[in-house]
Amino acid sequence: MIRLYDFGIWLYGFGLWLASFFDKKAKLWVLGRQDIFSNISSQITDNQPTVWFHCASLGEFEQGRPLIEKIKKDLPDYKIFLTFFSPSGLEIRKNYKYADHIFYLPLDTTKNAKQFLKIVQPQIVFFVKYEFWYNYLKQLNQEKIPTYLVSSIFREDQIFFKPYGSFFKKMLFFFDHIFVQNEYSKSILLENKVSHVSVAGDTRVDRVLEIQKNKRSFDEIIFFKGNTEILIGGSTWPSEEDILIKWIYTQNDLHWKFIIAPHDISEHRLLEIEKKLNVNSVRFSKANALNSAAAKVMIIDNIGMLSSLYQYGKIALIGGGFGNGIHNTLEPITFGLPVIFGEKYQKFEEANKLVETGGGYSIKNYDEFNYIMKSLENDDFYNNASTNAEKYVLKNQGATMKIFDFIFKGK
């Protein structure tokens, strides 16, 4: 099986190399790994103890981030070595100030794993949520380097628990401890004789509470909002935008305004959104006191401000639920916003709980969206939804401290 796995890894790398000739993201993936070991070696100039964090992309980074910053604050002698698998993580966070070194993870081969660990020499290793790389985990286990999986979620239908999944299940035993988000994940692992597990929760909750505490203010949004209510489309794709824009057409009064923060902020996508709108709109980058106040829709054409924008909102429509899975719902509910999203939310613990408690609503189409919006116009219905949304965050804080104390204080 290991030969088949290694061949699959090689084939994946070769496929990305071919794709790099015509795909920008694949090109970044390939170029970021050129001469990577010499680049890493040139940066490591001392023997200061190192903690290695590995994240697939930006979402996983946000889950690891609270723990990184806790270690930096309480254990400043440790250096943080941060790796990403995807360009969508590294390219956005390559200047992250709490990491001493930031690189792409070299392809998961036995040779690469040995060379990487020989150069980096981590004392402690954290893999975040869904990252399972056999050769790295096996080498870490053989070298007896403490390795932890944090903010993970497990389901019965995952390959680890299939009759043919023994090779992948073996990776779970390479971790010294697994911190899961919920009791269900723990029970699945225990049923499969993986006993080195505990429920810590989702570290992202601690992160969004920190964002709420230190939220940024934007004069442009204040001018834009005035005395209206704002419906925010967060990390939207065309499917959500079509629903939102259709609803905008029905709002002829001055009660509502709208913020659209698309997942893709390329010029092509921004123009596409503007073309669909038949109302006065303004991009954030071009906003001023005059045109903000006059606009019905503001389009966010940058990355990084959405998490603070939710403070101005009343309701949030979250993108991704009609595609591969919803984007961040924790950021809006921290500010007490009820959230609406598409059908594909089941892999996200917080979304499941929000639907159960009435703080979040899943929709299949425009008619269902319209029904939820009409329901939320009722003050009692809205206040109940807002309270339930905010309760989830307050109830589930503290995962970062649980993990930190377990590893560094032996609690």
Predicted feature locations:
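Low-complexity, intrinsically disordered, cysteine-poor segments enriched in small/polar
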Residues: 3-17, 21
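Active-site and donor-binding regions of nucleotide-sugar-utilizing enzymes
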Residues: 17-214, 232, 236-238, 251, ...
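Conserved catalytic-core segment of nucleotide-activated headgroup transferases in glycan assembly
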Residues: 60-74, 213-287
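Nucleotide-activated donor-binding/catalytic signature segment of Leloir-type glycosyltransferases, i.e.
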Residues: 93, 97-102, 271-300
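Hydrophobic beta-strand scaffold residues
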Residues: 145-147, 258, 281, 339
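Catalytic binding pocket for nucleotide-activated donors in carbohydrate/polymer assembly enzymes
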Residues: 175, 191, 306-391
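Donor nucleotide-activated moiety binding/catalytic core segment of transferases
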Residues: 204, 282-324, 329
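C-terminal alpha-helical cap of glycosyltransferases
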Residues: 396-411
